[in-house]
């Protein structure tokens, strides 16, 4: 008789952020996790809420030890979905949750295994009642510890993982729960600490490699090495690792160019890791991992094209300044473009010396605005002629604008406008209804609303001015002629 499926409810289903991320997925995903031959897009903000190990952005991979189907179940649990498992899938999921630091899923698996131990399969009841059996718990014969078992105590020595299972029956009268006694909880805590302190990449007791995660976050693009372990590492073919994170606009089909991540839209900073799109791309590493996917040259502008432009403007001697990127040989351009060894392309004329280090130069200052008009008295320069004429009145003392409401006189129109505000009036006032207007155009539009028969004889638009101007007509020769030289 087959066992019923096990249902693990997720405690994250009520989180509004997780609900939003689950609806948007795979949109706005800033993490791409490779498990075996499958890729799983995810949001680093959601993963960081359940595990520090998973809360990293970028392209990274899991080694042997976790199957794609098991990781898909773990990811569904993290995104707030209830997971239904077959009896044989519970233990691999619990081991994956323990290895990746998803404590809530590991505890849910412990509770599910404890409930199953309380309700054994009726088909195995006959085996439980046989007196010659040393144990009355069928789960112990199946290799699946029940609720009466203590948690696993894992100790790693010399690259080997030894599992010691200590079982005992709790005192009668206490409810049967996972880790019922305080001693069992302490042992479980110690075993977790040992697992966290154990180096990554060692072999387990069954000879298989544990979960191995390679991350690439160094901005320089140089290859980052794992810890040096006494035991051998898995073969290179068993890992789908990326040396550098791929940019979202080049490799992720569910992301569009310039689309921000989920955490940036929600205005919440990430908890762990650094933005993977800030890392410097390394074309050589991409070609090594994804041989059939060629990255356009335009994506390498922060490394290749920028280096060429900076090298063209950082020559140590005046005679060796190249004319542009075309002066570099094809081999030098390729080396500067890839940048896998960190060496820079040499400047033209210095092939036998080390490459010139590219240094950012400040942008050139914009050209000064031409000021052809100069005052004949003080030499102050102006770009417009009327500015020079207004300034010249400072030397002559001329104040051609006079207020119609008081004896105040001003040197220019803007000063007269400010003065009229002290009277609470606009520069223009209708002579029929007394309405004020801030500009001559608005006064002309206002006067069109009056009938021409209402206007007094000899009326002109100047009748609405609250100021008068006594500026003389412009002479043929201005007292402040523009200088012949603009220097």
Swiss-Prot record:
Return the similarity comment: Belongs to the krueppel C2H2-type zinc-finger protein family.
Stretches annotated zinc finger (C2H2-type) = 373-395, 401-423, 428-450
Compositionally biased residues, Polar residues: 308-320
Q: Where is the composition biased (Basic and acidic residues)?
A: 112-166
* Highest taxon of the lineage: Eukaryota
UniProt subunit comment:
Homodimer (via PTB domain). Interacts with the N-terminal of FANCC. Interacts with ZBTB16. Interacts with GATA3.
Q: Could you tell me which residue ranges the BTB domain spans?
A: 29-87
**One cellular component term from this protein's GO annotations in UniProt:** nucleus
Where it mainly occurs, coarsely classed, is nucleus
Query: Which cellular compartments is it found in?
Result: Nucleus
Q: Where do the record's region annotations for Disordered lie?
A: 112-244, 308-371, 468-487
- Could you cite one Gene Ontology molecular function of this protein? DNA-binding transcription repressor activity, RNA polymerase II-specific
Pfam families (UniProt xref): BTB (PF00651), zf-C2H2 (PF00096), zf-met (PF12874)
Q: Which UniProt keywords apply?
A: DNA-binding, Metal-binding, Nucleus, Repeat, Repressor, Transcription, Transcription regulation, Zinc, Zinc-finger
What gene name does this entry carry? Answer: ZBTB32
| Name of the protein in question | Zinc finger and BTB domain-containing protein 32
| Ranges of compositional bias, category Pro residues | 357-369
């Amino acid at each position: 008789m087959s066992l019923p499926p096990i249902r693990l409810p997720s405690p994250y289903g009520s989180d509004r952020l997780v609900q939003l991320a689950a609806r948007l997925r795979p949109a706005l995903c800033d993490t791409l996790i490779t498990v075996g031959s499958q890729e799983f897009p995810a949001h680093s903000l959601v993963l960081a809420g359940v595990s520090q190990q998973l809360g990293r952005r970028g392209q990274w991979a899991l080694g042997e030890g976790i199957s794609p189907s098991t990781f898909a179940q773990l990811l569904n649990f993290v995104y707030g979905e209830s997971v239904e498992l077959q009896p044989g899938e519970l233990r691999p999921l619990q081991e994956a949750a323990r290895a990746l630091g998803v404590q809530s899923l590991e505890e849910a698996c412990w509770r599910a295994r404890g409930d199953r131990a309380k309700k054994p399969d009726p088909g195995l009841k006959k085996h439980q009642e046989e007196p010659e059996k040393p144990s009355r718990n069928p789960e112990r014969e199946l290799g699946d510890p029940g609720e009466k078992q203590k948690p696993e105590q894992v100790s790693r020595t010399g690259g080997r993982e030894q599992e010691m299972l200590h079982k005992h029956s709790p005192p009668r009268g206490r409810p049967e729960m996972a880790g019922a006694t305080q001693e069992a909880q302490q042992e479980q805590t110690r075993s977790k600490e040992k697992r966290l302190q154990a180096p990554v990449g060692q072999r387990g007791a069954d000879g298989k490699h544990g979960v191995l995660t390679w991350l690439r976050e160094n901005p320089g693009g140089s290859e980052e090495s794992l810890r040096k372990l006494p035991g051998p590492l898995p073969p290179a073919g068993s890992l789908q690792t990326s040396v550098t994170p791929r940019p979202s606009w080049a490799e992720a089909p569910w992301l569009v160019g310039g689309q921000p991540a989920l955490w940036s839209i929600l205005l919440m900073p990430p908890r762990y890791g650094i933005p993977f799109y800030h890392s410097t791309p390394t074309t050589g590493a991409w070609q090594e991992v994804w041989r059939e996917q060629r990255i356009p040259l335009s994506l390498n502008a922060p490394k290749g094209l920028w280096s060429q432009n900076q090298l063209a403007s950082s020559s140590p001697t005046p005679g060796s300044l190249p004319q542009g990127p075309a002066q570099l040989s094809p081999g030098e351009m390729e080396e500067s473009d890839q940048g896998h060894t960190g060496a820079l392309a040499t400047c033209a004329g210095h092939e036998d010396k080390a490459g010139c280090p590219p240094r950012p130069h400040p942008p050139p200052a914009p050209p000064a605005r031409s000021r052809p008009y100069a005052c004949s008295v003080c030499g102050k320069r102006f770009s417009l002629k009327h500015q020079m004429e207004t300034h010249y009145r400072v030397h002559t003392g001329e104040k051609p604008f006079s207020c119609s409401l008081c004896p105040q006189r001003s040197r220019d129109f803007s000063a007269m406008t400010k003065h009229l505000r002290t009277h609470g009036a606009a520069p223009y006032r209708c002579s029929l209804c007394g309405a004020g207007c801030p500009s001559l155009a608005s006064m002309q539009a206002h006067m069109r609303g009056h009938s021409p028969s209402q206007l007094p004889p000899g009326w002109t638009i100047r009748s609405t001015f609250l100021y008068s101007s006594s500026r003389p007509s412009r002479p043929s020769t201005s007292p402040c002629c523009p200088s012949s030289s603009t220097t």
